Amino acid sequence: MLLAHPGGPYYVRKDDGVWTVPKGELEGDEDPLAAAVREFTEEMGSPPPAGELVALGEARQRSGKINLVWAVEGDFDVTGVRSNTFPMEWPPRSGRTVQVEEIDRAEWFDLATARVKIRKAQLPFLDRLAEGLDGSG
């Protein structure tokens, strides 16, 4: 399972429970699958591997946002990850703005390790992926 570690000062010393599937937000009336491919490309620095995209459904984050996720079997070299950036006030309440990478690294994990690393709200995606790999889903 390919997961991304969030960039920025809040996540420098955090590991378990903060990794995420590459994700983002829809722009206007953008098709959700097109948005997923665009966001993956922006966050990872290159497009997802070619192949059949399999829907893993949706899950709600603590913020209330809903993530729609697709899986694809393929190779992706994490050593070449180059994320886009966003402005963040840092230190907090300082009035200074710094550019922060959305993700600072990506790694491949087996499903058992991914369950420890991924945000709890995204665990349903791992369950659905495992069901599909077992042939029972």
Q: Where on the chain are the PLM-derived regions?
A:
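Active-site-adjacent beta-strand/loop module that shapes the phosphate/pyrophosphate-binding cleft
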Residues: 58-95, 107, 129-130
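The catalytic Nudix box helix
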Residues: 21-56, 70, 110
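Short loop segments at secondary-structure junctions
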Residues: 6-8, 73-77, 111-113
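Residues that scaffold the ATP/ADP-binding catalytic core of kinase and kinase-like folds
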Residues: 13, 29, 117
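Residues that flank catalytic or metal-binding motifs in active/ligand-binding sites
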Residues: 15-17, 66, 102
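Non-DNA-binding regulatory cores of transcription-related proteins
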Residues: 98-104
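N-terminal strand-loop-strand
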Residues: 1-21, 70
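Charged phosphate-binding loop/patch that engages nucleotide di/tri-phosphates or the phosphate backbone
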Residues: 107, 111-137
